[in-house]
Structure formats: structure tokens, C-alpha cells
């Protein structure tokens, strides 16, 4: 079967009150359009056609790697007109599935069922299948009109509906599937004689009835699947639905969430056994948490891997890090891209790392900046230590070998190497390589000025 998917993404999204095209607004860390494309990909289609219009170049440049065929709708003349733009690129015998880029939570299982529905009960497969739903509040959506036999014979858009029609709870989701040959016959016949002066895709229902093409409907069990996004309130509502579903899936697999309503996933989260996640944590990109990991409140993890038994304390930010087993991080720590910790390491409060590689058992417990640095095993970094890695033009590396003890308030001016088991005295500025097994410090005499008087404030007149 040749399957062609059309995604409608040309709308302006006026009610978003934004310079950003609606389909680029993010839900769970990804643009709305990306959600729909990723769902479409799971159906293994022969092609995905994205109809773009308003802000089209911005959409294409923002999502250059989407595996889609871009189709331009120069004038936004309605959904039927939008689908028509893609038809020259689609074979007559293909099945066409029409989706909307602002309906991001449609499930692949539902779409598979709809495609199957479009192939039933007719030898030549010439069936029009519609995805419908029963909603308590159908305001703004097209209503399904059925005859006395329960057969669909029309869809009436909200702006064209009278009060009797508006009371109908069954709505059309905007998702349909049929043969391309049907659409190629029906779409050129569309009229814009309606309240919005647009060419509605829903008018193809009347042509299907005239041609005696069977119309089948599939009712989704989950109303969120067909909820569209037209304003920021609806975006927030679907965000919470997505997050609640993600939280439930994690808890079903054994993850403990302190509060599922205060959890945010903006990518992929893979957890081992007995993982605990406290409130207000944000996971972005791909995050892997090993067995027994604990994440404290108000933490942000982006593209991070934690080994077994790690604990991240409150208010810590980790990005682009790989952490081995039994490490302790935070509170108030910042681990930037390129940080790697071997097992049993500790990064304490107000420590920032960047491109820092720690070997086993190394600790930096307080108030330090460690950038572009290699640290050996069992190194102790005192409070206030800074690797001075930038000369104004280039970055330079610091190497700290096994067993080094660095006293508090030390500056290591890179490039510099500290030999194994060396000790650096507190308050030192190290500009040259330090020999192993020795005490190195930079000393300035302590001086007392006797009889010195602290300046006193003058009284104002």
C-alpha cells in the first residue's frame, strides 16, 4: 500500500498573538509540527507532505532536518485548498491521510485504525474514513450530521451552524483518510460560499454522498487526541495532559515522583529501578538515570547520563554530562557540557564545571570553577579554586594528577600541570608546572600596620 500523509501547517495562528508561527510553538520541548511528523513517521509512509504558508520560510529554516516534502500554499484559502496543493505530488492509487499540525497528541494506534477503516467493506477500497469524537464542549469545531440510519451525510463548521447543529456533541477532528483519486475528483469542485469564504475540506463529504462513496467513522476514545491548539490556554492544557501521561508511564515502570503535577519532561527519560524524582524537576533532551538515583527538588537535567546510586541535590543544573556510579552532586551545582565523572566523585555547592573530567574518588566540595581540566584519582579541590582557562583569545587545559590536594582560594593559570600527590598551599596562584609529592605555594608576607585608624564617616551638616 502506498501511503501519503499530508500535514496542514499553513495557518497563521492569530489567537496566539505571536510573531512565531503557531506550529513552531513548543509542547513538551518540541515544536507542534515535530510532534505530528514524528507520529506520522511511525506509520512508515511513502511520503509526508507539509503544507506551509504563514511564516513558511521561518518554519522550514527552524526545522531543516524534518524528513518531509514542503508544499507552499501561497494564499491561505482554506483546508480544502491546502490539501489540493499537495495532490500533484501524489499518485492516484495512494491512500492519503490528512493531519493537522496543531493537533499534536494524536496517537499512532488511532491513525493505524483509521487507515484500516478506510479499506474496509469495499472491494475497490474507495472509502472515506473520518476520525470523530464526542466532546462535552464542542465549541469551535465542525459538527457531524447523520441521517436517520446513522450515516454521515454532512459536516457543518461552527460559523455556519444554527443553534440546533451547535447542540450536537459529535465533532470532526480534521483527520481523514481516503484514496488520492477521490480527492483529485472532489477538491477542484469545492466552493467558498460559506461564512468564512474558504474552501473547506469538509465539503468533500457531500461529494462522497453524491458519488455513493461509503463514509466510515472512527470514534477516538481519548478526547485529547483531537484537541487542537488555537491559543496559549489550549497549548498549556495539552502540555499538562502530555506531562501527566508521561508521568503516569514512568510511575507504571516503578519511578517514584514526589508530585506528578510538578514534573516536566521535554525529551526522553529512561530510568532504572527505584529512581526517585522530587518536585519541580525538568528533564530535557535524552536523560538516563541508573538504578537507585535520586534527584532533588528544582533540578534541571539536559542530555545527561547518571550511573547507579547517584544523587543530585536541590537546585542543581546539569547539561551534556556523563556521570558514573555513586556520585553526589550539589546542592546548587552547575555541570556544563563535556563534564565526565568517574565513580564515587563529589561536586558540591556552588561548583561549576565545564569540559572537566574527574577520575574516581575526586571531590570539589565548595565554591569552585573547574573548566577545561583533567583531574586524576582521589584529588581534593579546596573551596574557591579556579582554573584560569581563558587568555582572552584561546582556552587552555589544566592537568591535575592523582592524589593532589589543592588548598582553598587557589588559582591555576592554564596551561599548567600539577604532579601526582602534590599539595598546593591555600591562596596560591600557580603559573608553572608543580612537581609531584611536594608542597607548592605562592607566599606574600603578612604585614601589620600598628596605629592605623579606620576612616570614620563625617557627619552631614
Curated annotation (Swiss-Prot):
First-tier enzyme category under EC: transferase
Cofactor notes: Binds 1 Mg(2+) ion per subunit.
Encoding gene per record: glmU
Organism: Legionella pneumophila (strain Lens)
Species classification: Bacteria, Pseudomonadati, Pseudomonadota, Gammaproteobacteria, Legionellales
Keywords: Acyltransferase, Cell shape, Cell wall biogenesis/degradation, Cytoplasm, Magnesium, Metal-binding, Multifunctional enzyme, Nucleotidyltransferase, Peptidoglycan synthesis, Repeat, Transferase
Binding site for acetyl-CoA: 383, 389-390, 408, 426
Active site, renumbered: 366 (proton acceptor)
GO annotation terms (biological process): cell morphogenesis; cell wall organization; lipid A biosynthetic process; peptidoglycan biosynthetic process; regulation of cell shape; UDP-N-acetylglucosamine biosynthetic process
Reactions performed catalytically: alpha-D-glucosamine 1-phosphate + acetyl-CoA = N-acetyl-alpha-D-glucosamine 1-phosphate + CoA + H(+); N-acetyl-alpha-D-glucosamine 1-phosphate + UTP + H(+) = UDP-N-acetyl-alpha-D-glucosamine + diphosphate
Name of the protein in question: Bifunctional protein GlmU
An example Gene Ontology CC term for this record: membrane
Self-association and partners: Homotrimer.
